[in-house]
Amino acid sequence: MKKFLAACAIACLPLSAMAADAYTVLFKTHGTFQDVRDALQFAIEGKGLKINHTNNIAEMLARTGPEVGATKRVYENGEQFEFCSAVISRQMMEADPHAMVMCPYIVSVYTIPNDKNVYIAYRKPGPTRNPALKKALANVEKLLNDIVKDAM
């Protein structure tokens, strides 16, 4: 009975994390791109973070494709939100000044042709031997994961 209830609970989740490469954390959900995109934006801003820039990746690829001889449509919709956390970024860069390359944080939201899912993804912080940086990177990943969960 416990297994059945656990299976039911999992099936009811509006969001599922997918196996991805070691550098990517990938989630998929249902809904419209615009609704998921807006929920993600509100989740970022709800943490008190300012979105520095929004990259419209799908539009850029569609626009530049003909110039490079590409005809495949990679995304129906696809945007990235760039932002940083002053607190977590400072922890990270105090632990290792070279960790500046980890900022800004980017969360992507996109749809793929012939796929009804909406995907949200972010880069997984890499491994390090520096204990202070390891802790700061764990905080970065927790922040990104919390944002995605809040968006759902």
Where are the model-predicted features located?
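Terminal, regulation- and interaction-focused segments at domain boundaries
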Residues: 19-48, 55
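Beta-strand/loop substructures that line and gate deep hydrophobic ligand-binding cavities in soluble
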Residues: 103-133
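C-terminal partner/receptor-binding element of secreted or periplasmic proteins
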Residues: 122-152
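Sec-dependent signal peptide recognition
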Residues: 2-7
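Compact, glycine-rich, soluble single-domain proteins
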Residues: 56-102
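Hydrophobic h-region of N-terminal signal peptides that target proteins for export
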Residues: 11-18
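Solvent-exposed, acidic/flexible segments
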Residues: 29-37, 54, 74, 130-133, ...
